[in-house]
Structures are given as structure tokens and as C-alpha cells.
């Protein structure tokens, strides 16, 4: 199997080491569409990350959870990242998965453009994704298609924009702390 290349970034070379090769090989057997679904595979700082095309996320998630040889039955966390310089792939969502059965840990990473920030929801695959998808929507603006109640969870319902994005204005709201006022970040002293 040839490893796909994305924007000049090749996959990490095989062998990956540890159980990573076994997971990658088992996944390739369990999911025949893997070469189409995976953009690249990275091993960095002791973490195995599969970069998944968003249209294959749900299928791959079901295989990772349900295949007896893999059994990634727990979604530990789901988080968003905004890379404004990664044109056409500005929004990333990272899924941390654990196999309690085999004591293994992997990550999935899915990217979407600002112009079309839709990624399939995995709430019905891993219920722990529920509030985490809502938080990622609230903070980054990623729309999780199929989520049963994609509403704001941290910010007020009428809050404009998504405050964790790097293009979000730093304005701020003046805060009073023990009688002293803290100005918004835009009005604070600049340090060179």
C-alpha cells in the first residue's frame, strides 16, 4: 500500500513502532476503503494520528468502534483547532480514541474549509461526543451534521461569532475586579 501525500507532507514512514503498525494493518483489513479515507498517517511524540477525509469519518468511526480486533469504544475528547493559513482546510477537529479492551490510544484528525465548515457528527457512535461537539461548534463554528441538539453550550445564545477562532476580534468586555477595571485586550499596554 502506498502512503498518500497531502500538500507535500508525507505520512510517517513504516514501521511506526509499538502497536501502531498492528492497528494500521488491522484497520486496512477491516476497512477496505482506507486508502480513500486516509489523507496521511502521522506518528509524532508517541501519538498515532490518522488524517481522515470528512466524508469517510462516520464509516471509519463505526469500524474503529465495532471491529473486534480494534474496539476503540471510548472517545476521550474532541477538540477544535483553527489554522487560518491552511487555506481550504482552516478548521480541524481532533478525536482522541481509546480501546479499553486492548489498552491502546489513537487520534483522528478531520479538516474542513471555513467556507463549508461541516463535519459529520459521531454522537451516535460515541455518546461522549455530545457536549464536546457542542463546545467545538460554540468556540470554532464547526457544524456537526446530524447532531441532535447543536446549540451553544458556553456562550450566550445571541453571542456573535466563535471566540476561539484566530480571526475573532480581541475586543472584549470591561471587567471590574475588586473595584479596579480591567480594560479589553485591545486597549491594554503593548509590549515589544
UniProtKB/Swiss-Prot annotation:
Q: Which InterPro entries match?
A: NADH_DH_suC (IPR010218), NADH_quin_OxRdtase_su_C/D-like (IPR037232), NADH_UbQ_OxRdtase_30kDa_su (IPR001268)
Which gene is annotated as encoding this protein in its UniProt record?
nuoC
- Outline the segment boundaries, as ranges, of region: Disordered: 170-192
Which reactions appear under catalytic activity for this entry?
a quinone + NADH + 5 H(+)(in) = a quinol + NAD(+) + 4 H(+)(out)
The protein's job, in short, is: NDH-1 shuttles electrons from NADH, via FMN and iron-sulfur (Fe-S) centers, to quinones in the respiratory chain. The immediate electron acceptor for the enzyme in this species is believed to be a menaquinone. Couples the redox reaction to proton translocation (for every two electrons transferred, four hydrogen ions are translocated across the cytoplasmic membrane), and thus conserves the redox energy in a proton gradient.
**Enzyme group, top EC level?**
translocase
NCBIfam families on file: NuoC_fam, PRK07785.1
- What family is it from? Belongs to the complex I 30 kDa subunit family.
Subunit comment for this entry? NDH-1 is composed of 14 different subunits. Subunits NuoB, C, D, E, F, and G constitute the peripheral sector of the complex.
* Keyword annotations: Cell membrane, Membrane, NAD, Quinone, Translocase, Transport
**Pfam families given in the database record:** Complex1_30kDa
- Provide the protein's localization: Cell membrane
Give the record's GO CC terms: plasma membrane
Give the signal sequence positions: none
EC assignment? 7.1.1.-
Q: Please give, as recorded in its UniProt entry, the membrane topology of this protein.
A: Peripheral membrane protein
Supply one GO molecular-function term. Answer: NADH dehydrogenase (ubiquinone) activity
Q: What is this protein called?
A: NADH-quinone oxidoreductase subunit C
Amino acid at each position: 500500500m502506498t502512503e498518500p501525500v497531502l500538500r507535500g507532507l508525507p505520512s510517517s514512514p513504516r514501521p511506526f513502532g509499538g502497536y501502531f503498525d498492528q492497528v494500521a494493518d488491522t484497520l486496512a483489513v477491516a476497512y477496505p476503503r482506507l486508502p480513500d479515507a486516509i489523507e496521511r498517517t502521522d506518528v509524532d511524540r508517541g501519538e498515532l494520528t490518522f488524517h481522515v477525509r470528512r466524508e469517510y469519518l462516520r464509516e471509519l468511526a463505526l469500524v474503529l468502534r465495532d471491529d473486534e480486533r480494534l474496539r476503540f469504544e471510548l472517545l476521550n475528547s474532541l477538540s477544535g483547532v483553527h489554522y487560518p493559513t491552511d487555506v481550504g482546510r482552516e478548521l480541524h477537529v481532533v478525536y482522541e480514541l481509546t480501546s479499553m479492551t486492548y489498552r491502546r490510544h489513537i487520534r483522528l484528525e478531520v479538516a474542513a474549509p471555513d467556507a463549508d465548515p461541516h463535519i459529520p457528527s459521531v454522537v451516535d457512535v460515541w455518546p461522549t461526543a455530545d457536549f464536546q461537539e457542542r463546545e467545538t461548534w460554540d468556540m470554532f463554528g464547526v457544524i456537526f451534521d446530524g447532531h441532535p441538539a447543536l446549540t451553544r453550550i458556553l456562550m450566550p445564545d445571541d453571542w456573535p461569532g466563535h471566540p476561539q477562532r484566530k480571526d475573532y476580534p480581541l475586543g472584549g468586555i470591561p471587567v471590574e475586579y475588586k473595584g479596579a477595571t480591567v480594560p479589553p485586550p485591545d486597549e491594554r499596554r503593548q509590549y515589544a
